[in-house]
Amino acid sequence: MRLSTLSSLLLGSSSIVFARVPPTVDNQEPIKSTSYFLDDPDFPSHFEFENPETNCKYVSQPWIYNAFNSVSEDMEAVFKYAHPDLHVRIMGHHPFAGYYHNPKMAFVNSLWRLNNCLKDAKVDAKLWAIHGGCDQAWSVQEFYFNATTNKGQPWELTSLWVSRWDEDGLIREVRTWVDAGQIMRTLWDNEIWFNSSDRVHHYDFIPGPGGLPPIANKTELGGEL
């Protein structure tokens, strides 16, 4: 087994047994909204599982809760449960969007970069809900993030993760949705440079969404590709 939190394999069965936890979790701190425009989110004082079953083929909802709920203290926590060949697709049209072929690149280019824009690299992250999982390979996690930016501005973000798990409790595939406008505004306001500066050494072509010019295949430039 790859995860210390797995309890055991059922003998003679392909099901995975995860540590039993109550069907509700009551230790969540109330969310304190920093939004100028919204009242405090209608966030429950305790987390209720749609399916509290822990005798599961894949991962149970209580196990998913324990795995993802620590992201506020450790941004890397999510990727501790990533398969080495995990593929991540960040949906939308913004600097984080794209298809990542390994978890390390996805983490550095998104969560790590975003975390560096937040004061003291601290963020309050909570789960709104968990759907699916258990005997289904796919699960959906709804997150709410709350922090203060390096410039002292209140910051909020809601994110949706759609995850495919294997029978060892590792994530094999992720599609995630974020607020593109919030991401772009946060990077623009809090990064000293926006993807590049005169201190960056460029060794790869970065032509933008339009791709390389047609002349690239007719000159020595084409031989370098």
UniProtKB/Swiss-Prot annotation:
Keyword set includes Glycoprotein: yes
Biotechnological and industrial applications of this entry: Phomoidrides A and B (also known as CP-225,917 and CP-263,114) are potent inhibitors of Ras farnesyltransferase and squalene synthase. CP-225,917 and CP-263,114 inhibit Ras farnesyl transferase from rat brain with IC(50) values of 6 uM and 20 uoM, respectively. CP-225,917 inhibits squalene synthase with an IC(50) value of 43 uM and CP-263,114 with an IC(50) of 160 uM.
Keywords: Glycoprotein, Isomerase, Signal
EC number(s) given by UniProt: 5.-.-.-
Glycosylation sites: N146, N195, N217
InterPro entries: NTF2-like_dom_sf
Catalytic activity: 2 [4-(deca-1,8-diyl)-2,5-dioxo-2,5-dihydro-3-furanyl]acetate + H(+) = 2-[(1R,8S,14R,15R)-11-hydroxy-14,15-bis[(6E)-oct-6-en-1-yl]-3,5,9-trioxo-4,10-dioxatetracyclo[9.4.0.0(2,6).0(8,12)]pentadeca-2(6),12-dien-8-yl]acetate + CO2
Annotated pathway: Secondary metabolite biosynthesis
Enzyme class: isomerase
Signal peptide: 1-19
Molecular function, one GO term: isomerase activity
Keyword Ribosomal protein among UniProt keywords: no
Database matches in SUPFAM superfamilies: NTF2-like
Functional summary from the UniProt entry: Dimerizing cyclase; part of the gene cluster that mediates the biosynthesis of the antihypercholesterolemic agents phomoidrides which are dimeric anhydrides. Within the pathway, tstC produces the bicyclo[4.3.1]deca-1,6-diene core of phomoidrides via the dimerization of the monomeric anhydrides leading to prephomoidride. The pathway begins with the highly reducing polyketide synthase tstA that catalyzes the formation of a C12-fatty acyl-ACP, starting from one acetate and 5 malonate units. The hydrolase tstM is involved in the release of the C12-fatty acyl chain from phiA.
Similarity annotation: Belongs to the dimerizing cyclase tstC family.
Protein name: Dimerizing cyclase tstC
Source organism per UniProt: Talaromyces stipitatus (strain ATCC 10500 / CBS 375.48 / QM 6759 / NRRL 1006) (Penicillium stipitatum)
